[in-house]
Regions:
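Extended amphipathic alpha-helical heptad-repeat regions
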Residues: 1-35
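Catalytic cores of secreted/periplasmic lytic hydrolases that degrade extracellular macromolecules
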Residues: 21, 25-90, 96-188
């Protein structure tokens, strides 16, 4: 399945505007992949809907983030899912990508793990008083502005739709999914 997903992903990235049948094939393959993971593990991640709760526990999230600087924030990702309804795995993977797994200067010095308010490398960003505050603020902002139909940046509830306003990079959603894949590999 990984090989099929990678092949479809490459085809999509090579096109300026994804062709419907390629995306449809990718979605079918990805659905089989997610079902396979769910069969062996109750943790859920749906890249087409970040409002679907993961059901991840704090200990599972710690295991998923093991070996990274984000491991101490595992309970915060779970809390954010319960409070704001944003999938904890998706939120953690955004933090993993945006902060280089918690090692970036912004993460360490500015408590900005999610790229919140950062629109260029020079941008100051919207920093928080603590690491936990940044994660909770981002979850609240995603829930309110990106994942609800009356939200200012709403284009849909999936990573690709969030990508439109969250990041200037058109490959952002794919990179976030790659982080998710790494997290699930840690869980097995």
């Amino acid at each position: 399945l990984d090989k099929e997903i990678n092949q479809c992903g490459r085809k999509l990235r090579n096109l300026k505007k994804p062709v419907h049948h390629i995306r449809s094939k990718y979605e079918k393959i990805h659905t089989r992949y997610v079902k396979g993971i769910r069969k062996h593990n109750p943790v859920i991640f749906n890249p087409y809907d970040l409002t679907v709760r993961s059901g991840v526990t704090k200990s599972q999230m710690r295991k998923m983030l093991e070996g990274s600087e984000l491991v101490t924030l595992a309970p915060v990702f779970v809390k954010a899912e319960h409070k704001y309804g944003v999938n904890a795995v998706g939120l953690a993977s955004i933090a993993a990508l945006e902060s280089a797994w918690g090692t970036s200067r912004r993460a360490r010095q500015d408590h900005n793990f999610t790229g919140f308010g950062v629109d260029s490398d020079d941008a100051q960003g919207i920093n928080a008083a603590s690491d936990q505050a940044n994660i909770m603020r981002t979850a609240k902002w995603l829930a309110k502005s990106y994942l609800t139909q009356d939200g200012i940046y709403y284009d849909g509830t999936g990573l690709m739709e969030i990508n439109h306003h969250y990041s200037a990079s058109f490959t952002w959603a794919w990179k976030v999914e790659h982080c998710v894949k790494q997290m699930f590999e840690n869980l097995q």
